[in-house]
Amino acid sequence: MSRLNELLQQAGNIGRNEDGSITRLGFSEKYFQALEFLKGRMQELGMQVEIDPVGNLHGVLQGSDPEAKSIVIGSHMDTVMQGGVYDGMLGVTGALEVAARLKDEGRTLRHPLEIWGFNMEESSILGGTFGSRCVTGMLDPDIPGYAEKLAKFGCSPEKAKAAKRDISKYECYLEYHIEQGDKLDHTGIDVGVVSGIVSIIDYKVTAKGMSNHAGTTMMANRKDALVGMAKLIVAAEERARELNDTLVFTVGKIAVSPGQENVIPGQAVANFEMRHMDKAVTDQFYADIQAFAKEIPNCEFEFVNTSAKYSTPCDPRLIKLIDDVCTEKEISHVIMPSGAGHDANAMAHEGVPIGMIFVPSVKGISHQGDEYTKPEHIDLGADVLYQTVLKLDENGV
């Protein structure tokens, strides 16, 4: 087993459940256990290390040029409930492998090399990419009710503000990640050069009907909110398949009121999520869903936009640089979008050029205990990351 694969298994298995899955939620005991473990590895590599006010891990290898901006590599160290070893942690340990190879070769970069292990990238009441949004200053902790949410994690608006960095000193941000989809695995391609991160648009959809007795209300007289919601979901699912072959639509949560087996549901609330690179596609899809809702009898629908993270393009220069590295090393690769959100979003939102490198997820499985990427792909992707850093150090973005 390679050094990187061994480190990934050690760090990534912190928080292992009896069923083999991993639960290492942001701000949890297991999260900070992983943080301390990786902090020790950073110190072994001679990095200047700190834990910032919101639980992000930060390490620096100083460069030879005090005027040069930092090359930044990172990802997140938290998982979803019952997640896997590789999501996020691959990027942090892969970044540490870059630092380790520099040490092996006695090489000092001209640019400082900064490595971030971010807290709470996964969705929570604080919103996704929490740690990186604090670092970039993208997060506004003063919005109403947010202080109470932060307090649940022993955090505060003051700590969130104190985590902000001067990202004008960042040359670029690179993130090494598993694909979390099946394109690379299905096609047998070794590396994905990410072109951008898709829009993720969420709506809270409420169907309003009328609660009544389940036994005495005839079928012709019912105003069943759950039936209306089901019809809308099926119509939206079919439309998503027709509209665009890279549009994805998910209803991951639904709640019914009053939620009793002998009462017709008077209300159903669901989360509708749509993802695509092109805003015009998600706008059209949303308009189509609203039109479908108007045609469904015995129900009224209300739509509230709860989150809108619009697509983020990767920097064309970094796309070309990573593409060139793969070509020079004769690594099979493809330029492709990311269907998942990443900490790179927050960096790009505040003007930092971003690049991302994907390696295959076996069977496209992620956010589950059987998430898996082959060891040879892990080492291959890390080498692409290392060579990219060397080229960036020589020529800049």
Residue locations for each model-derived region?
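Active-site metal-coordination/substrate-binding segment of hydrolases
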Residues: 39-43, 48, 57-132, 136-151, ...
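N-terminal capping segment at the start of a domain
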Residues: 1-28, 305, 365-366
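A non-catalytic alpha/beta surface segment that caps or lines the substrate-entry region
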Residues: 16-62
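Zn-dependent metallopeptidase/amidohydrolase metal-coordination segment
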Residues: 7-13, 17, 74-75, 333-387, ...
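A short beta-alpha structural unit
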Residues: 24-26, 250-259, 271-277, 301-319, ...
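His/Asp/Glu-rich mid-to-C-terminal helical/loop segments that flank catalytic regions of hydrolases
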Residues: 195, 217-219, 223-242, 359-397
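Acidic, glycine-rich active-site loops and adjacent beta-strand->loop/helix elements
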Residues: 55, 77-79, 116-125, 180, ...
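Midchain, well-structured core segments that form catalytic/ion-binding scaffolds
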Residues: 120-128, 132-279
